[in-house]
Amino acid sequence: MPKKKTGARKKAENRREREKQLRASRSTVDLAKHPCNASMECDKCQRRQKNRAFCYFCNSVQKLPICAQCGKTKCMMKSSDCVIKHAGVYSTGLAMVGAICDFCEAWVCHGRKCLSTHACACPLTDAECVECERGVWDHGGRIFSCSFCHNFLCEDDQFEHQASCQVLEAETFKCVSCNRLGQHSCLRCKACFCDEHTRSKVFKQEKGKQPPCPKCGHETQETKDLSMSTRSLKFGRQTGGEEDGASGYDAYWKNLSSDKYGDTGYHDDDEEEDEAEDEEEEDGKDSDAESSDLFNNLNLGRTYASGYAHYEEQES
């Protein structure tokens, strides 16, 4: 018969379970809720932007900096592992900070744990917008992640990108390697794969997760759970409207059918335009002939253009 658990043992097991859950949840923190990507309002210019060490617009320093790792604005002496020891009960402002992250451009407090772990675990390490290719240092807004392909997006492109993200680079939902229906879709490659071709020797499937994409290794999703649409290609007369109003094959057949029933108005207009163009060309030819007759009797004497230049050179 097992021994009965004591109160201290129960507390220790519960503490270990909570710590395990916290460690697992840190890797799945929403990018919009991370302290280094928090929303900040400048004290001087009152413009809202991403959490930064210096204002992106006026370069001023904030009165209460926010730590990019733990998110605190006040360092308590009793409950922290401060690298810089401060004599008071707590410290705020520039007395609390210890470094600036090169990736997220935000302050990191002078706690030993934050200084040693933030640079390696910063979620904005390679944060470059997939649409405009701007990084954290190139614009003042916050960084977001696409909910479909999980690529980085800036504030300007996040809505437009996510509205057009679920579009396949194909005209059908068939697997790119065979002719069967693609049951799994990769939203980064914009391609579908069947069950057989999702098995890859390069990328291994983790337990409890969807199979990875055989091309890029990103986790695929079931096509039936997505609002996927295919790319539509238009050729020839299907491309759109034209200047004369005849767009597409429908308008072409409508014009033919109207000619059969005696509707010749369209052709009458063309004939009138052709006659007007012919009259303009004839008037232009007549005016050119009259101008040439005026200069035929004009005599300018011996000139270089008339061919007498070499005679004048010999005489001199």
From Swiss-Prot:
It comes from the Eukaryota. A motif (Nuclear localization signal) lies at residues 3-11. One of its GO terms (molecular function) is zinc ion binding. Residues 1-24, 227-299 are annotated as: Disordered. GO terms for cellular component: chromosome, centromeric region; ciliary basal body; cytosol; midbody; nucleolus; nucleoplasm. It is found in: Nucleus; Nucleus, Nucleolus; Chromosome, Centromere. The modification Phosphoserine is found at residue 287. Its main location: nucleus. Residues 268-291 have a biased composition (Acidic residues). Residues 10-22 have a biased composition (Basic and acidic residues). Coiled coil: none annotated. Keywords: Centromere, Chromosome, Metal-binding, Nucleus, Phosphoprotein, Repeat, Zinc, Zinc-finger. It holds the Pfam family NOA36. A zinc finger (C4-type) spans 42-58, 67-104, 129-149, 175-189. Belongs to the NOA36 family. PANTHER family: ZINC FINGER PROTEIN 330. This is Zinc finger protein 330. It comes from Mus musculus (Mouse). The gene is Znf330.
